[in-house]
Amino acid sequence: MSTRDWQVPVLTYHASTVGGPDYAGNDHVAFASDLETATRLGWRIVPLQWVVEQRLGLADRDLTRCLALSCDDGTVLDVHDVDYPGQGRQPSFLTLLEANHGQPDRHLTCFVIASPEARARMDRDCLHGLDWMGEHWWAPALAGGRIGIGNHSWDHNHPVMAEPGPGNMPRGDFHVVDDDVRADYEIRQAADYLAARLGQDACPLFAYPYGHAPDFLVRDWFPRHGARLGLQAAFGTQGGAAGPGSDPWHLPRYVCGLHWSSPAQFEALLASLA
């Protein structure tokens, strides 16, 4: 375990949040602004994996005034510029990240949904039916060096899946993943799918859908099964910076739009952690 006194805020965005041209309704605008603000204020962007390695005692880096980046759900908007219906051209998170040359260690972890059926339904019902939730971009993005791919469950237990899950599991809530059968369905199945496509141990991080972290998973299932699945840590959305005392199976993240929604609020958030 590191003897350094460290805390690292993990910031989370959703590339599908494109509700207009302004910061509060467009995570691409927010992402670009936040990168500029963080760099101007002397914060260093580091890979999310570094945060996990520090917490697990696998590394002892100087993480003073560092932050890490993540995004959830895994749309092509994470890595490719698109023409968004009604909103015009949107630069991807990767495009914006690569343009920030003042951050040599810049990196973004994209937490993706594994199930092809779930992604197809979400693309049709929640986006614009433009095949923005395919998996064709995963391997090239991972190989490029600026993107990590993380596990965001099999199907997010999303309500687009009209049929109940295992054991008549209701949809739209991840707190109900509360036994071995449901956990295997949502997490183990996703880990196996990602490993088959990206390589064993290529996706060691998990993010809880909706930020819901059931005690069963945090205190029981992940400690028993995580390592065998190649998983090292899991992230919530409860706010707060990751540090030496953080639970590795429920590491905190801040979410754009939930914990801050303007440049001034973002700057205040960083100031509170400096």
List where the protein language model places each region.
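Charged, glycine/proline-rich intrinsically disordered loops and linkers
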Residues: G74, H80-P91, G165-V177, V218-R228
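Low-complexity, Gly/Ser/Thr/Pro-rich intrinsically disordered linker/tail segments
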Residues: S261-A274
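Alpha-helical scaffold elements lining the catalytic groove of polysaccharide deacetylases
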Residues: V82, M133, A139-G144, G148, ...
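N-terminal carbohydrate-binding accessory modules
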Residues: M1-W6, V10
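Structural detector of well-ordered beta-strand residues that form the stable sheet scaffold
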Residues: T109-F111, G150, Q232-F235
